[in-house]
Curated annotation (Swiss-Prot):
Organism this protein belongs to: Xylella fastidiosa (strain 9a5c)
Protein name: Lysine--tRNA ligase
EC numbers on record: 6.1.1.6
Source organism phylogeny: Bacteria, Pseudomonadati, Pseudomonadota, Gammaproteobacteria, Lysobacterales
Gene this chain is encoded by: lysS
Entry-linked InterPro entries: Aa-tRNA-synt_II, aa-tRNA-synth_II, aa-tRNA-synth_II/BPL/LPL, Lys-tRNA-ligase_II, Lys-tRNA-ligase_II_N, Lys-tRNA-synth_II_C, NA-bd_OB-fold, NA-bd_OB_tRNA
Presence of keyword Cell wall biogenesis/degradation: no
Length: 506
């Protein structure tokens, strides 16, 4: 079907088109029918297409003889004028369907009104069904009403919304003209629903914890600061819900989870947005080994539920979520990719400093061996982890809330899940020793005073909660946006956020 659309966004005077459409709206206002709101839709495009899909059964003659009628509404996406008979296409949330519009069926006045409609207008139609000579199912329209006049023209069919920044800024237009974008966000909704269903079936309790914190804690990140006028109090948008969720475990809610927004005052990239969605859960009487099992099974089951497969392609890489995820100690992974580094050197600060210098990795003088080991891991190992891999046993220095290993002092019972070189999840056996936690908080305070903006604050109330006793607990955080990227094959986090952060338009 040929669309009556300009051939290029830059080849027409948009202001002139808008002025022309405003004139049409003015005429509608004069008639008192500019924005009617008394239409009842009974059918959707996709349902009609499926119900009458069999071409051999539902011939044009059979359709017209059946007497079936539809009442539909949607956006006019294409029109082709052909004298006394014309074709058009409308789009609703389910898909598109063709319209056959004939002056002798619709009536001369209504047909004339149809001819001056613009692509982008929202209309309601009623009629029977037929099939064209090419076999396309069509609504034979005998009632047509304009519901909403579109004042701005849509991008044309051939060039579409090619400006990526415009797609993000004007997501409402992107969703109209880009079916692939619409499908991503439908899948996002299904993914989050599948995660909830999975956890609810295992008797996890969904909870809501504060979005504004007196003390920003639960993650090493720089917070956004706000102010409560009535309380005369500085508050912080939360960087993580962790410390509040663990307070609930102290209170006896032994399996809790939250899917909500976190805010971190940091940079923007294809993997980072200052506002993002996290799934965080805690289970009493669980270790990090069991939490790894949980994370692996939940991600695999979610993929199977939403996609019908455990195999996905992400940024050109074929990812298989079906096999057991690899588990690899951080120090062993570093030594494997850097044969010059011995396992003994992984806890030797001076040796690691020399290796960082050799590898041209920039580090700060305040870094201990734990941060140095992490720096080497991030520079030489992380990007190589294509298939799902749990990196385990992180240094205490970079894990202030994780339980220290009983076997290897200086390391923790912690893991991070990497897929295609990107961190998807983080979890550990929780530190439930209040005195040890207080000592680690104090070290974080010293780091902050030394210029580390991402170091944690000292949370005295959380220490008080731990002093009442928290059961041995395992915790997990999954970046929902990155999981959606994985399961939709999206290469930028902005492609899976309806309204990603952008600098204001000038």
């Amino acid at each position: 079907m040929t669309e009556h659309l300009p051939t290029s966004q830059v080849s027409f005077d948009e202001n002139a088109l808008i002025a022309e459409r405003r004139a049409k709206l003015l005429a509608l206002r004069a008639q008192g029918v500019a924005y009617p709101n008394d239409v009842k839709r009974e059918h959707y495009a996709a349902d009609v297409q499926v119900a009458f899909a069999n071409v051999e059964t539902w011939t044009a003659e059979a359709l017209e003889a059946s007497g079936d009628r539809v009442r539909m509404a949607g956006r006019l996406m294409a029109k082709r004028l052909m004298g006394k008979a014309s074709f058009a296409q409308i789009q609703d949330e389910s898909g598109r369907i063709q319209l056959l519009i004939q002056s002798n069926v619709l009536g001369e006045d209504s047909y004339a009104a149809f001819k001056v409609l613009d692509v982008g207008d929202i209309i309601a139609v009623e009629g029977g069904l037929t099939r064209t000579r090419t076999g396309e199912l069509s609504v034979k329209v005998n009632v047509l009403r304009l519901l909403t006049k579109a004042l701005r023209p849509l991008p044309d069919k051939w060039h579409g919304l090619t400006d990526v920044e415009q797609r993000y800024r004007q997501r409402y237009v992107d969703l109209i003209v880009t079916p692939e974008s619409r499908e991503i966000f439908i899948k996002r909704s299904k993914i989050i629903r599948a995660l909830r269903t999975w956890l609810d079936a295992r008797l996890f309790l969904e909870v809501e914890t504060p979005m504004m914190h007196y003390i920003p804690g639960g993650a090493a990140a720089k917070p956004f600061v706000t102010y409560h006028n009535a309380l005369d109090l500085e508050l912080y948008l939360r960087v993580a819900p962790e410390l509040y969720l663990k307070r609930l475990v102290v209170g006896g809610l032994e399996r809790v989870y939250e899917i909500n927004r976190n805010f971190r005052n940091e940079g923007v990239s294809t993997r980072h947005n200052p506002e993002f969605t996290m799934l965080e859960l805690y289970e009493a009487y669980s270790t990090y080994h069991e939490v790894m099992d949980l994370a692996e099974t939940m991600i695999r089951d979610t993929a199977q539920s939403v996609l019908g497969t455990t195999q996905v392609i992400w940024d050109g890489a074929q990812i298989d979520l079906g096999p057991i995820f690899r588990r690899w100690r951080m120090d062993e992974a570093v030594c494997h990719h850097n044969p010059e580094i011995s396992v003994a050197e992984c806890t030797d600060r001076d040796a690691l400093l020399l290796h960082c210098e050799r590898l041209k990795i920039k580090v700060k003088s305040s870094y201990g061996w734990g941060r140095l080991l992490l720096s080497i891991f991030e520079a030489t190992v992380e990007h190589t982890l294509i298939q799902p891999t749990f990196i385990t046993d992180h240094p205490v220095e970079i894990s202030p809330l994780a339980r220290e290993s009983d076997i290897e002092p200086g390391y923790t019972d912690r893991f991070e899940l990497f897929i295609n070189g990107k961190e998807i999840a983080n979890g550990f056996s929780e530190l439930n020793d209040p005195e040890e936690q207080a000592m680690r908080f104090q070290k974080q305070v010293e780091a902050k005073e030394g210029g580390d903006d991402e170091a944690m604050y000292y949370d005295a109330d959380y220490i008080r909660a731990l002093e009442y006793g928290m059961a041995p607990t395992g915790g997990l955080g999954i970046g929902v946006d990155r999981l959606v990227m994985l399961l939709t094959g999206s290469t930028s986090i902005r492609d899976v956020l309806l309204f990603p952060y952008m600098r204001p338009e000038r």
